[in-house]
Curated annotation (Swiss-Prot):
Pfam families: SPOUT_MTase. NCBIfam families: PRK00103.2-3 (NF000989), PRK00103.2-5 (NF000991). This is Ribosomal RNA large subunit methyltransferase H. The lineage of its organism: Bacteria, Pseudomonadati, Pseudomonadota, Alphaproteobacteria, Hyphomicrobiales. Its EC number is 2.1.1.177. The keyword S-adenosyl-L-methionine applies. It comes from Methylobacterium sp. (strain 4-46).
Amino acid sequence: MRLALVAVGRLKRGPERDLAEGYRARADALARGLGLSAVQLTELPESRARRAPDRCAEEGAAILACLPAGSAVIVMDEGGRAVTSAGLAEQVAAWRDGGRPGLTIVIGGADGLCESVRHRADLVFAFGAATLPHGLVRVLVLEQLYRVMTILAGHPYHRGAP
């Protein structure tokens, strides 16, 4: 199953980028043995439209154009539902074992996501109700992908609840 992360905006050099690249490298090292690909990162430019609804629509169209047919889609949104790491691992395994060709995780722009992107999602996911900086969300998404892989591989990184 192909793994992809689509994010609006670029991560500048700094600690968030270093952490994101570190977790991505760790995930990539485990992926093949689990029937998964390395994580493909697509950074989309932020819209320069003047009005927020226009920016959301423009960025949404660019996001939708990046979603492969048949791919499972997780959209990061503060209004989404919280899922445990073990629950996320179960869902990823179910998509993989069910023959889904890919999994794409989407991080929208500063103005959020348009409804058409949310509608395309198989899972609207949140790390909580708080609004988080996009760079930090990217780090957390890649850490969770790595954690999912360690759970699927039986690696001791994820200790979970006793």
